[in-house]
Amino acid sequence: MATSQYFDFAQGGGPQYSAQPPTLPLPTVGASYTAQPTPGMDPAVNPAFPPAAPAGYGGYQPHSGQDFAYGSRPQEPVPTATTMATYQDSYSYGQSAAARSYEDRPYFQSAALQSGRMTAADSGQPGTQEACGQPSPHGSHSHAQPPQQAPIVESGQPASTLSSGYTYPTATGVQPESSASIVTSYPPPSYNPTCTAYTAPSYPNYDASVYSAASPFYPPAQPPPPPGPPQQLPPPPAPAGSGSSPRADSKPPLPSKLPRPKAGPRQLQLHYCDICKISCAGPQTYREHLGGQKHRKKEAAQKTGVQPNGSPRGVQAQLHCDLCAVSCTGADAYAAHIRGSKHQKVFKLHAKLGKPIPTLEPALATESPPGAEAKPTSPTGPSVCASSRPALAKRPVASKALCEGPPEPQAAGCRPQWGKPAQPKLEGPGAPTQGGSKEAPAGCSDAQPVGPEYVEEVFSDEGRVLRFHCKLCECSFNDLNAKDLHVRGRRHRLQYRKKVNPDLPIATEPSSRARKVLEERMRKQRHLAEERLEQLRRWHAERRRLEEEPPQDVPPHAPPDWAQPLLMGRPESPASAPLQPGRRPASSDDRHVMCKHATIYPTEQELLAVQRAVSHAERALKLVSDTLAEEDRGRREEEGDKRSSVAPQTRVLKGVMRVGILAKGLLLRGDRNVRLALLCSEKPTHSLLRRIAQQLPRQLQMVTEDEYEVSSDPEANIVISSCEEPRMQVTISVTSPLMREDPSTDPGVEEPQADAGDVLSPKKCLESLAALRHARWFQARASGLQPCVIVIRVLRDLCRRVPTWGALPAWAMELLVEKAVSSAAGPLGPGDAVRRVLECVATGTLLTDGPGLQDPCERDQTDALEPMTLQEREDVTASAQHALRMLAFRQTHKVLGMDLLPPRHRLGARFRKRQRGPGEGEEGAGEKKRGRRGGEGLV
C-alpha cells in the first residue's frame, strides 16, 4: 500500500538507505500534513509547523538540502491529546545526491533510541498517521501534534491521503531550494502571529546523555494555530517542504517553478535562564551555568521565598527591581542600579527576547508576598506556545528558551502581569527623611547627609576633579553619586559620631555577624543559667531530703537473702542499687530524730510572742538612747563645757544586739527567756543602768499598748516581762567593748577614769561580750550546716531531760556538734549526725586527757569545757557510750525519750492468707507495747 511504501525503515535497527527511487503516490489537492504525539513521552506542548504553500504535482522534487525521514515501527496505542511540548529524538539523516557534495558526515541515532520512537504502521488503514520532516538551519527536530479532527476528504481522493491532524493555512511557506544551495541558506521559518504562553517544557523521561547529545539540534518550537475548517487548496505545481521517504534519495531533482524568497541572516540560539535573568551563547555554557553555584543559590532562594540578593550587612531591603531581582536599600541605590550596566543589559535582553518588562517604579520588597519571587511563571516569547490545560506542578527549574527571529507581539492573556508597585514612586535621590539627622531603620541611603564638609575634592594639575577623599573615614571614591551615598552611610556616621559629634543618633540594628555573635553569647549564658539552676535544684533536693521524710529505703518486692534457693547464689543487697548522687535512703534513726525535733520545736504562738516582745524592747531602747543623748547635750550646754573630744556627738547607747539562743535560732518549746546585749560608748555604770531603767517604761508605753514590767538587776541586767500569755522575758545586758580592752595599749589617749565602785561587774560585762562573739561565730559557721541546728536542738532537749547531760555547757555542745558534722566525709542525715556526736563524746573527747575543745572566739587558748569537773566529764562520756549501745540495738526512741514509731506500710510486705480476727491483732500489739514499755532509757 501507499503508506507502507512511504515508511520503509525497519523496526529496531538504524536508518536504511536505498538507491532505487520508489514509486510514490502523489497527494491530492486536499492533503494536509499531520503530526501525532510520540508515545512514551510526558505531556508537553505540541508546537505547530509552518504552513506549506500549494505546489503542483508534476514538478515535485525532493529538497536540495538534507532530507528528513522517520523510522517506522508497529502502530502503538495513541495516547490522549497532551499540552506539553513533546520532543522526538528519532532522527535519520538521509542525504540526497545533491547534498553529498557538501555534507559528508551523517548524523545517526543509536538503535536504542530509535526503537522507542512512534511511527506510522505499515498497514494501509484509514487511521494511519504520517510523519513530516521540517528543515532547520541547525539540525533536524520534529514536533508531534495531538491528533485532532481530520478534514473532510473529497470522494475523488485516494484512501492513502486520509489523515487525522491539523490543516495548516497557506499564508506563508518555505519554498524549495535549488540543488546548489547550502545548508546555511535556508530561509528563516515564518511564525504565526498568534502567540501563546510559554510553559517551560521539561524533559523528565530523557536521559541526561541523550539530552546533552541532542540539545544542539533542537529547532525553535512553533505555536499551534486553532483548528479551523478544512480548506480546499488549488492544485499546487509542486509540494514544498514535504517529507520524503528514504528511497526518494536517488530520485533526480525536479526544477523549481516557484521563486525562492530571500533568506535572512542566520539567527543564533539563545539559552535563557529565568531565575538568573541571563542568557547563554551555547548549550555547553548553559549547562555549566545550571550546574554553577550562583544558579543553585538563586534557585534555593526561590524555593524558600527569600530574596537571593539581600541588602548588605543585614539591613532590611526597601526597594526591589523586579526585572533584575535585585533589592536596593534606598532611592539613591535604586536609581544607581537603573542607570547601571547590569540593569541595562538585562533590559536589552528582555526586549530582544520579547519578554514583558516590568515597570521601573520601585516596589517595596517588604510589602510583596514572600512567594512572589519563587513562583514559577511562564514568560512569553516568539517561540513559545500556550497549552490548552495547565501543566502539572513541578519544582521550579531554569527554563531554556531557544529564540530565533524577530519578536512578535504578545498575545493577550498569555501570562499574568508582573508585580506592580504597591506604593507610589518615592522621592528622588537625596530626599531627607522626616527624622532629621536620625538614621532610617530600613537603610542609610534615605538619611540626611552628615558631615559633607569632611569630604574634600582632589584636583589634577589641570584643575579637573580626580576623586573625592573623606578625612574622617580615610577612604576615596571617584563618583559624585558614591560621595552622596557615603555621607549618608552608616560607616561615615559612625566615624562622625566617634570623632566629631558623640550625640549623633545611629540605628542600632546589628549586622548579621554581630547578630550571630550576640546569639552565641546569649546561648552560652542560657546554658550557664540552666546549669546553675540545675545545681540549685539539686541543693534544694538535698535539703528537703534531710529535713523532710524521704521515700522508702527498701524497694518493693525485695525478699530477704535467706528466702532465695541455694543454687541461685546470693543476690545483691538493696543498698547496691544505683542511687542519685547526694541522695540516701531514710533510716529509722532519721525518722525518730525528725519526729522528736518536731515535738520540741516552738509553736507558732510562742514564736510570735517572742518576736513581739523583742521588737518592742528594741524600739523602746532606741527611744531611750535618743532621750539620753538630748539630756547629755543640754547638760553640756548649761555647764559651758568647751573641751574638745574625739567624738563630741557620740551617743551613750550605741546599739542593741541579739545574743544567745535567740540569735542562734535554737529556741525550744517552753523557752520563755531571751537575751539582748546593749552596747555603750563608755564603761557602763550603775547610774547609767538606773537611768535606762527609769526611761524604759515610759518609752514602752509610747511604742505599744501592751503591758510590760521593767525590773533592774544589780548585776548589769534589765528584765522586761510581758503581762500577757505566754509570758516572755527579755533580759538586757549592758556592756561595752572598753571592758575588754587593756588601758596600757593606748597610753596617749586620756580618758576620764570613772569611779571604781560605780562600774558594773566586769565579769558580767565580759560574759555579755563573749555571748555576742559566740552569736556571730554561730551564724557564720553552724547556721549553714543543715543537720547541725537540728542536732543541737535535740541535744539541748537531752541536756534538759537528763541531769547527767545538764552539766555540759551549751557553748561546748555547740562547738562539739559543729566539729563532728563538718568533719564528716559526706552529707549526714539527722540520725547519723546524732550517732556521730555520741561517738565523739564516747571516745573520750570530754575527758581531761582527751583532745578537748578549743574556744575559737578567745584571744588566748581557752578550753570550752573548763567549767566541767572531772566527774561530770566521766558521767557524760559513760552516758554517751550507753546511748550508742541503745542505738545499735534499735532503741533510738529510748535515747530521745519518745515512743517507738510504727513501721511504715510497705507495698511488698507479706500478708496472711487468712484474715486476722477482730481482736487478734490488737491483743498481740498491746502485749508487745506493754513489754517494750518496761525498758529503761538513759541514766
From Swiss-Prot:
Residues 217-239 have a biased composition (Pro residues). The gene is ZFR2. Residues 516-549 form a coiled coil. Residues 570-935 form the DZF domain. This is Zinc finger RNA-binding protein 2. Residues 906-916 have a biased composition (Basic residues). Residues 1-72, 116-185, 217-264, 289-314, 360-389, 401-449, 545-590, 906-939 are annotated as: Disordered. It comes from the Eukaryota. It holds the Pfam family zf-met. Keywords: Coiled coil. GO terms for molecular function: double-stranded RNA binding; single-stranded RNA binding; zinc ion binding. InterPro entries: DZF_dom, DZF_dom_C, DZF_dom_N, Matrin/U1-like-C_Znf_C2H2, NT_sf, Znf_C2H2_sf, Znf_C2H2_type. PROSITE patterns: DZF. Residues 137-147, 157-184 have a biased composition (Polar residues). SMART domains: DZF (SM00572), ZnF_C2H2 (SM00355), ZnF_U1 (SM00451).
